[in-house]
Every structure is written in C-alpha cells, then in structure tokens.
Amino acid sequence: MFNVSSPCVMLASSCSVKNEQIWRCLTRPTCSAPAFPAGRITALQALDVWKRHFVENGVTEPEQSSQYIIAHLLGAKTIESVEQQRLAEFLSKEETQQVWRLCSKRLSRMPVQFVIEEWDFRDLTLKMRPPVFIPRPETEELVELVLTDLQNHPGSTETPPTCLEVGCGSGAISLSLLKSLPQLEAFALERSQDAVDLSRENASRLGLQDRLKVYHMDVIKDAEQMPGLFSSISVLVSNPPYLFSEDMATLEPEISRFEDRAALDGGEDGLNVIRQILTLAPDFLSNRGRIYLEVDPRHPALIRRWVEDNVEELRFVETRQDVSGKPRFCILQKEESHKAPEVDQD
C-alpha cells in the first residue's frame, strides 16, 4: 500500500532517505526525466526504469510510485492485479508517452494521488486534485470511530441522525459516512472553493449529492453568519488544520508544494481552528451530541484543559490512539449547562 501518512509523520527530518537525496530536486527547477526509449519497451521495463530514476533523484517510495502510476495506466488499482502477460507485453508508443508524462509529474514530487487524479478512501474511490488536501489513513480510523458510535447509538427512529463536517476537503469523511449509513444526512463547511467544488463533484459521482450540502464558508471568518444554519446536529467531525506553524517549514515537498497550506497550518500551537470549532459547537449540537477531532498527538491534554476552562457546555470524553499508538483522536460531548441563569436586576 502506498504510504500516505499524516503531515505530522511526513516531515523531511523523519524520512529514511538521506536528506541530500530528498532535497536534490529542490536545488534546481526540475529533475530531468530519463531519455525516452528509442524502441518499444514492456511495462516491466518501464517500471524498472522509473523506479531507478526515482531512487537516483530522491523521490520517496520509488517502487510504489512507479507501480501505482503504471498500474493506473493499465486500468488497474495495483500492479499485483495486472496479469503477468500484460506486464510482459510491449507498451504502445502512446502508452509509453503516458508513462513518461505521469512519472515526470511524480519526479517533480507531485503526490501519486494527484498524478493519477484519484485515490481510494475506505470503500470509495474519490477524485483528487491539487491543492485539495489528500485524506490520510488516520482519517479512515476517524470515520470508523464515528460509525461505531452512530451504529451503537442510532438515536430516534423518527429523527434521522445528522452530521456536520468542518473542513471537508475532498469530501472523504462525509461521503464515507453517508455511504455506510443510509439514514444519515450531512452538512459540510469548507473555506476553499477548490475543495468545495471537488467535494460536490465526488458527491455527484457517488450519487450522494442529495444527502450532502456543502457550504463555502470559513469557520473563523464567517462565524457570525452561521447561527441558524445548523441545529440539533448529532455529530460534528473534523480533521482540521492542526500542524504547529513551526513545523510547516520541514514538510516534505509532496506536501509543501502541492497541498493547501491553509488546510495544514493550525497556528502557533496548532489549535487556531480547533478552538473555534469547540467554541461554536454547543450552538450546533443536540444535547449529548458528539464531536470527533483528528489532532496532533500533543493536543489532547491541551484541548481537555482549554475546554474545561472555556466551554462549559462541552465535556471531554476520551482520547483514542491511532493504529501507530499515537493519541490522535479527541471525542467530546455536549452536556446540559449547569450555569445559573442571570437574574434581571431591573
């Protein structure tokens, strides 16, 4: 499986490839593609040529990169699903040109997802386009958390559950939830017009456009316009920008060059958008409605303390670990406020 890790684990300093290899392409405008073959070559030969060229130029995951691109051009998801006979056949001139064109994009450090313009998220195949944030495996785990809770606590049969996603990107979270829960209806907020358009396109391709309403709104800048738009929401879910600003300079070029920086940078402590979500959430959620956040492993303790000090209507329920054992997900719940009502002195 091609490793699409969260931005936190894709810092250049943590890559296993030598730093001088990683950054070689950054010292010049472009890396040159290998010479176009004079004669015909097979898919296996093309795989070998591009794997070696990616290695020589410090492209991360060189073998997987060439395999996914060439499998895509052969109409398959993975190279393992392509028949060996097909791999041993000569490529047509047009196919070879396509291999060189797409692999040259990867050579520029464009993520494979953007090169082939699609990617699988759980059981969905979604269109991908820069600069819209690419969903990571950790976010699939976030969806599983939400699904488990909604399936175990479906709520009233008379009132279908509703979900609000803040920062929907490609639509991966909302669309995955809608596909798994036929009774669910979803709303999404997204500041980027590129992401709004891509979410709507993915919803239409999956036949889910009638159950997902995407608003082109910034949760911080457009906060005053939001009251009344949403109420009695069962679940609020978000994979918000949560990187510490100081970490932005050390991101891999796949991220820093091609993905929307605003979808990554969470401010000095990574909590700018998260604090805003938690401030607004009580106005949107039904009583005992829940919030599910994907966060930096340094965040859960900070979020717990901040909520206790600033948002009386929310209770921090628990922190969940991701598959790597890192504290990655925060679950909170709206509770009835116990604050005494103000007494009119007149």
List the model feature ranges, each with a label.
Residues 1-38:
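N-terminal mitochondrial targeting presequence
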Residues 2, 70-149:
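Conserved AdoMet
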Residues 16, 37-50, 61, 111:
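Short, structural beta-strand-to-alpha-helix junction motif
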Residues 69, 109, 139, 173, ...:
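Residue-level signal for inorganic ion chemistry
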Residues 141-250:
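Conserved SAM/SAH cofactor-binding pocket of Class I
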Residues 241-273:
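Mobile active-site "lid"/loop adjacent to the S-adenosyl-L-methionine
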Residues 268-334:
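Conserved Class I SAM-dependent methyltransferase catalytic core
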Residues 336-346:
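Flexible, glycine-/basic-rich loop-and-beta segments that form/coincide
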